[in-house]
Curated annotation (Swiss-Prot):
<dbReference type="InterPro" id="IPR042118">
    <property type="entry name" value="QueA_dom1"/>
</dbReference>
<comment type="similarity">
    <text>Belongs to the QueA family.</text>
</comment>
<keyword id="KW-0963">Cytoplasm</keyword>
<keyword id="KW-0808">Transferase</keyword>
<dbReference type="GO" id="GO:0051075">
    <property type="term" value="F:S-adenosylmethionine:tRNA ribosyltransferase-isomerase activity"/>
</dbReference>
<comment type="function">
    <text>Transfers and isomerizes the ribose moiety from AdoMet to the 7-aminomethyl group of 7-deazaguanine (preQ1-tRNA) to give epoxyqueuosine (oQ-tRNA).</text>
</comment>
<keyword id="KW-0949">S-adenosyl-L-methionine</keyword>
<dbReference type="Pfam" id="PF02547">
    <property type="entry name" value="Queuosine_synth"/>
</dbReference>
<dbReference type="InterPro" id="IPR036100">
    <property type="entry name" value="QueA_sf"/>
</dbReference>
<dbReference type="GO" id="GO:0005737">
    <property type="term" value="C:cytoplasm"/>
</dbReference>
<comment type="subunit">
    <text>Monomer.</text>
</comment>
<protein>
    <recommendedName>
        <fullName>S-adenosylmethionine:tRNA ribosyltransferase-isomerase</fullName>
        <ecNumber>2.4.99.17</ecNumber>
    </recommendedName>
</protein>
<dbReference type="InterPro" id="IPR003699">
    <property type="entry name" value="QueA"/>
</dbReference>
<keyword id="KW-0671">Queuosine biosynthesis</keyword>
<comment type="pathway">
    <text>tRNA modification; tRNA-queuosine biosynthesis.</text>
</comment>
<dbReference type="GO" id="GO:0002099">
    <property type="term" value="P:tRNA wobble guanine modification"/>
</dbReference>
<dbReference type="InterPro" id="IPR042119">
    <property type="entry name" value="QueA_dom2"/>
</dbReference>
Amino acid sequence: MLTLSDFDFDLPPELIAQVALPERSASRLLEVDNPAGAAGPARLIDRRFAELPECIAPGDLLVFNDTKVLKARFLGQKASGGKIEVLVERLTGERTALAQIRASKSPQPGTTIRLADAFDVTVGERVEPFYTLHFPDDCLTLIEQFGRLPLPPYIEHDPDSTDETRYQTVFAQNPGAVAAPTAGLHFDDALLARLDEKGVERATLTLHVGAGTFQPVRVENLAEHKMHSEWYHLPQALADKIAATRARGNRVIAVGTTSMRALEAAARDAEAAGRPLAAASTETDIFITPGYKFRVVDRLVTNFHLPKSTLLMLVSAFAGVETIRETYRHAIEQRYRFFSYGDAMLLTRRDA
């Protein structure tokens, strides 16, 4: 049985990308081509991300996550004058949101907090591990006007105007995430146009990435880990495109682990209900580890993930544990850039 320690590796800190490259598609792409069937080593091909159209067949379907990152981080003050840090996790209504709150002493329901020295919110009920916050006006408007972009904890600079552009995908449409679907950051309009010209199909879903994506796994036995929950919407048009892709013998390619989680969660629920994949708008806490049976995704575009993370477990389940170990060894030797602003992989499902 695999344990948390099986997903650890040593990463030189200088390989953690701190800034985005000047051009989105100038990042590197490590193509990991698993052989047909389960046997044999994968072929590793060093590329540039701009070469992605060469790796994809006409008629294949790319599935993107069109979530948009909120300016969800605030510094504030309690009525007592104590400093507080707030990270909005999820919008729950026009004037309400769930948030993480860091303070020397937990705020009590009914108390007010001043955010960004601009407006007051009222603390409502506790919804573990979050607090309900009541805003004085439309919370999305206030968040976008006064909040700060919530860069990941391993990025060591304060967000600037470059981050406000580059920590969003060019196809971001639906505000609600507190972290970017980072595989999508490599796509620019010119690359999307080249994919269209080749006859590659495109479709979108929405999964609002939560702060839980950065939470470490704290138990050695993976079965004891409680996965965070995230909301997603899979439109019927995407379900229809997937069925058509399957019917003509083409492959479904998830852009990012967030797209993967939404697709596989919807397919698993559909299978359990004895029906074909269809539109879905719901929560998922799907935890994909080696041994999981993939139902939809044939290939995956994804960045390089943190040691001991649930996303490293996901890609290991998808491409094979040994394949991912060899891929990461190669990436470190070849000085690929890691994490959100880093380079990418194109993985093929091990049994595909």
